Amino acid sequence: MSGVWVFKNGVVRLVEKQQATAGTAVAGGRRKALVHTPSGQVVSSYAALEARLTALGWERYYEDPSLFQFHKRGSLDLISLPADFSAFSSVHMYDIVVKNRDSFRVVDA
């Protein structure tokens, strides 16, 4: 049983955790999507994300098969993502946005 306990009008109830579709994350009951700002396109796969990050100077690490990792040469930044794109959450999206402020943003899907 997973979800969030909600207290409203003196009543406590459990709201079941929603299943997110691939490439979206549920935060506060709203789905999130990662958008490549220059093109306005939603990132819908790791292949699309890898192409965008590579163009920005990020290099892919292949050491750990359970993670999808990128490093930017000349910096200490590392982006670590779950190997399964369906587990890609808003936390991962915001990590990408913070490290690439002008290139990505997170929006309500």
From Swiss-Prot:
Keywords: Cytoplasm, GTP-binding, Nucleotide-binding, Nucleus, Ubl conjugation. One of its GO terms (molecular function) is GTP binding. GO terms for biological process: negative regulation of mitotic metaphase/anaphase transition; regulation of flower development; regulation of root development; response to auxin. Its main location: cytoplasm. Disruption phenotype: RNAi mutants display reduced seedling height phenotype, because of abnormal cell division. InterPro entries: FPF1. A motif (D-box) lies at residues 73-81. GTP-binding protein that functions in the development of root systems, which are mediated by auxin. Acts as a cell cycle regulator during root development. Proteasome-mediated degradation of the protein is necessary for the transition of metaphase to anaphase in mitosis. Overexpression results in reduced growth of the primary root, an increased number of adventitious roots, a helix primary root and a delayed gravitropic response of roots in seedlings. PANTHER family: FLOWERING-PROMOTING FACTOR 1-LIKE PROTEIN 1 (PTHR33433). This is Flowering-promoting factor 1-like protein 1. The lineage of its organism: Eukaryota, Viridiplantae, Streptophyta, Embryophyta, Tracheophyta.
